[in-house]
């Protein structure tokens, strides 16, 4: 039985003027009988030239989530605007996400990430499932699903993640006990990045990087620096047309391409290691790459492309979610204690079978959903619709680009009563259809979803048994949009042994 939390929790107010946030109802009003035309959708207007200047000056759009949240407050649960000659419709209610899912084809289409595509085209490399659309996307995705999402795959990679999670906690415990105070205060974000990088890389390539405290390889440092640089430069380039940034941001483009080149070279080496083991007849350890090679359904180029994207997409997203969960647990000690009791009660079954963490920690799973409600790392889900549909009684024609803003959905009092409160138990009280979309939906949902869930559940389970997590900071973290939604600075957390 899930442990329930009844104590007061700290208010999470990661946006301005929460007490004036308007509840944008879902189905309270009877829709008018006459269908409204697309042109009647409220329009969000902004001066595109001033916006470009702002993006150039700020090297990104750090307040995008706040700007869109304010637009919903002013215009209602649906609005439209134009960008690059295309019409974009923005929504934020679960019912509209469900309607998008209902009309989704077997080939869901989304906009490619231009800086990543530019690198692939310049270097003559193939795209992976993150960047592909159409039949090529479907073929690649069907080959990868069994290695990432199936029960058999989860059973295969859980032991890999559990080893890394235990190593990480043991190393942190050792550092804590070496401190004369018997506790340790650290900037947790870099530590979470190292953990998720180590775990994801181990699952995908079958090799350890040494980021959790031992056997650190020089090439691992170069590789992780390249990942950081790639994400930073992506943010600086993604909001402006390449025709402009090729002149205004030549240094950033060079950094972006150089970073991807390092990542590409590193992944090539990992794939060659797998082929070498096969050629030498050595015992093959399980990994996502070795499974792709063994299946022989994807070309070497396709394996390389998908491996690059899997590694790039599995690190920061999970690390940020772990950081924000630990921060909320630190300032909500009663929630933390309830989770600790759940972990201790489930410890025997998880020791016998680490995969039990997926089923025996319902409150911890709910806490992760609550974190992603307040801090959706991927702050929106987007689709180019393949057929006409009706959203909020407006006609939306096929070919329209529709964006679901998760940041605003998670803060809508009509969807989540008392949205400012960190309340994991809300996810255990009733089914919430299309309200947990942090990993997307449908056949194009996040390919690394199960890996991310396992990494978060196992690490938090081992940490809660071992450490009391505290913080002196009770005010909210300022969140910024840098390709991903992340804290503007890392929270400083204190770890003490559990008494």
Curated annotation (Swiss-Prot):
Range of the transit peptide: 1-24
Primary gene name: Cyp11b1
Classification of source organism: Eukaryota, Metazoa, Chordata, Craniata, Vertebrata
Family per similarity comment: Belongs to the cytochrome P450 family.
Organism: Rattus norvegicus (Rat)
Function: A cytochrome P450 monooxygenase involved in the biosynthesis of adrenal corticoids. Catalyzes a variety of reactions that are essential for many species, including detoxification, defense, and the formation of endogenous chemicals like steroid hormones. Steroid 11beta, 18- and 19-hydroxylase with preferred regioselectivity at 11beta, then 18, and lastly 19. Catalyzes the hydroxylation of 11-deoxycortisol and 11-deoxycorticosterone (21-hydroxyprogesterone) at 11beta position, yielding cortisol or corticosterone, respectively, but cannot produce aldosterone.
UniProt xrefs under Gene3D superfamilies: Cytochrome P450
Outcome of substituting residue 443 to M: In strain: Dahl salt-resistant
Catalytic activity: a steroid + 2 reduced [adrenodoxin] + O2 + 2 H(+) = an 11beta-hydroxysteroid + 2 oxidized [adrenodoxin] + H2O; 21-hydroxyprogesterone + 2 reduced [adrenodoxin] + O2 + 2 H(+) = corticosterone + 2 oxidized [adrenodoxin] + H2O; 21-hydroxyprogesterone + 2 reduced [adrenodoxin] + O2 + 2 H(+) = 18-hydroxy-11-deoxycorticosterone + 2 oxidized [adrenodoxin] + H2O; 21-hydroxyprogesterone + 2 reduced [adrenodoxin] + O2 + 2 H(+) = 19-hydroxy-11-deoxycorticosterone + 2 oxidized [adrenodoxin] + H2O
Membrane topology: Peripheral membrane protein
Protein name: Cytochrome P450 11B1, mitochondrial
Annotated keywords: Heme, Iron, Membrane, Metal-binding, Mitochondrion, Mitochondrion inner membrane, Monooxygenase, Oxidoreductase, Steroidogenesis, Transit peptide
Enzyme class: oxidoreductase
């Amino acid at each position: 039985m899930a442990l329930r939390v009844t104590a007061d929790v700290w208010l999470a107010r990661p946006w301005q003027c929460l007490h004036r946030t308007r509840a944008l109802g879902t189905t309270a009003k009877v829709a008018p009988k006459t269908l409204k035309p697309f042109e009647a959708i409220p329009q969000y207007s902004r001066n595109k030239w001033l916006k470009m200047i702002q993006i150039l000056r700020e090297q990104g759009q750090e307040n995008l989530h706040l700007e869109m949240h304010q637009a919903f407050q002013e215009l209602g649960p649906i609005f439209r605007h134009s960008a690059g000659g295309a019409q974009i419709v923005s929504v934020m209610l679960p019912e509209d996400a469900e309607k998008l899912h209902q009309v989704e084809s077997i080939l869901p289409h989304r906009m490619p990430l231009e800086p990543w595509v530019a690198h692939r085209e310049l270097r003559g490399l193939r795209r992976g499932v993150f960047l592909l659309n159409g039949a090529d996307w479907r073929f690649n995705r069907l080959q990868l699903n069994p290695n990432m999402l199936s029960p058999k795959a989860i059973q295969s990679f859980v032991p890999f993640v559990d080893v890394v999670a235990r190593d990480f906690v043991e190393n942190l415990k050792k550092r804590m006990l070496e401190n004369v105070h018997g506790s340790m205060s650290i900037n947790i974000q870099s530590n979470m990045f190292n953990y998720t990088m180590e775990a994801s890389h181990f699952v995908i390539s079958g090799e350890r990087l040494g980021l959790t405290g031992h056997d650190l390889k020089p090439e691992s440092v170069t590789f992780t620096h390249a990942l950081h640089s790639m994400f930073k430069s992506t943010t600086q380039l993604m909001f402006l047309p390449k025709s402009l940034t090729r002149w205004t941001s030549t240094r950033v483009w060079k950094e972006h391409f150089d970073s991807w080149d390092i990542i590409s070279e590193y992944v090539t080496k990992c794939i060659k290691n797998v082929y070498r083991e096969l050629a030498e007849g050595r015992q093959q350890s399980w990994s996502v790459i070795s499974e792709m090679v063994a299946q022989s359904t994807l070309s070497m180029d396709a394996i390389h492309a998908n491996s690059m994207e899997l590694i790039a997409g599995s690190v920061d997203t999970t690390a940020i979610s772990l950081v924000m969960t630990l921060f909320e647990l630190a300032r909500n000690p009663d929630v933390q204690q309830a989770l600790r009791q759940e972990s201790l009660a489930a410890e025997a079954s998880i020791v016998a079978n680490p995969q039990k963490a997926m089923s025996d920690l319902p409150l911890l799973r709910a806490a992760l959903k609550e974190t992603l409600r307040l801090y959706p790392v991927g702050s929106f889900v987007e689709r180019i619709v393949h057929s006409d549909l009706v959203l909020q009684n407006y006609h939306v024609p096929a070919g329209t680009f529709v964006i679901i803003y998760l940041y605003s959905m998670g803060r809508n009092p009509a969807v989540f009563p008392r949205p400012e409160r960190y309340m994991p138990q809300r996810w255990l009280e009733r089914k919430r259809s299309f309200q947990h979309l942090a990993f997307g939906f449908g056949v194009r949902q996040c390919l690394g979803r199960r890996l991310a869930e396992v990494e978060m559940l196992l690490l938090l389970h081992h940490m809660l048994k071992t450490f009391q997590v505290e913080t002196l900071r009770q005010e909210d973290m300022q969140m910024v949009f840098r390709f991903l939604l992340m804290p503007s600075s890392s929270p400083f957390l204190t770890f003490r042994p559990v008494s």
